[in-house]
Amino acid sequence: LHRRRHSFPTRRSSDLMHLRKNKAKGVAINGLPIRKARELLGVVNLVFFSPEDLNIIKNGPGERRRFLDSELCQLDGVYITELAGYNHIVNQRNRLLKDCYMNPGLKSTLDVWDMQMVDYGKKIIGKREAFVEELNEIARGLHKGLTGGIEELEILYEPSVTAAEFEDKLSRNRERDLRMKLTSVGPHRDDFCVKVNGIDIRRYGSQGQQRTAALSLKLSAIELVKTMT
């Protein structure tokens, strides 16, 4: 057993974290074992840099949603519960959509899932929108500094549907969802656009532009963690 000790400053005190090698459940704070990842929320806030950060820009919407959710979960302890609840409902709804193909009588039960999905979804949309706005404000200044003022970065939230329209669009898409056997609208299909000098660099940016933009995003996330925790 190899044990390493690291002291992390928090809002409450200087907590002692133990990381144990080769142990699936090898994290403890002040001697108390951490059994769920969510227990670390609000205790230790980390922004990790890696070569894979470039994927935030160049890969698909799923990568960018993971970035948003990862950062929001650090800043908002309730968000992880809302996100887990929403994802559970989407999975259950998709299963029900498939079951409706063989048993059309189950269609009436979709209303219950839709109501819960809209409730969770509106909260997620609102928090993602606010986070992207904050991120954009910080990233613009940081990016100008990184590029010597040559490039102007803009980050725009691209929700699958607005919070105000979610309930109506989910209802209007029901027949389509039944045919496709999946849920076609909601935060699980969100994205955000990254522009440099007005050009969408997700599709048309050079690797250098994408790398610098990804760095700006991560540095901005650090600033948000510092100011909001």
Residue ranges of each PLM-predicted region?
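Nucleotide-state sensing region of NTPase/ATPase domains
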Residues: 7, 11-63, 69-79, 136-141, ...
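Long, charged N-terminal accessory/stalk domains
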Residues: 55-56, 62-111, 115
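Conserved NTPase motor "head" modules and their coupling/switch loops across ABC/AAA+ ATPases, GTPases
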Residues: 101-229
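Short C-terminal domain-edge/linker segments immediately following a structured domain
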Residues: 57-59, 78-80, 88, 184-189, ...
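Short, exposed "boundary/linker" segments that immediately precede the start
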Residues: 1-6
